[in-house]
Amino acid sequence: LIHEVTSPQAFGMLRDLNLKVAYPHRTFATVDHIVPTDTRLEPFADPLADAMIRELRTNCEETGVTFFDLPSGKQGIVHVVGPEQGITQPGTTIACGDSHTSTHGAFGAIALGIGTTQIRDLLATQTMALAKLKVRRINVTGKLRPGVYAKDVILHIIRQLGVKGGTGYAYEYAGEVFDEFSMEERMTVC
């Protein structure tokens, strides 16, 4: 998955290296961060935002990448578009230049937030070099008390592990509490 903020540089690197998008049918783009909430009409009041959407459109048109554009009815927040459009499935690997990419883990996907150079590598090869992650399973049993929600659960876990507790790990969440969570609650945790 790609969006307008982290992909332009990756497409530029591809051009500089005379590389093409290897599998455009496996890459999906949406305009996300720059879309005004009060109106989605173009041109946007912000000229930089307008330029960013035009550049993403051009990059997708030139490379054959599927673009969920504003008028398509499929455009939205990049870490929500994947599940909404059926792209995110159990067992798939989802990578995106967005810190909320881990949200896809709620659907049983391996979800990786990556940088611009890794976006370039994925576009060019559909592969990327990764250090082997350790796996940490978090098991939460019992019932949540009234007024305790998914956000409270994950904040408690983060408090126990520390803000760097996830570095170098892939997390599995298990137990009665997670089993009973809705998909929205699981997305909150991931």
Task: Name every feature range the model reports, one short phrase each.
Residues 1-190:
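Fe-S-dependent hydro-lyases/dehydratases of central metabolism
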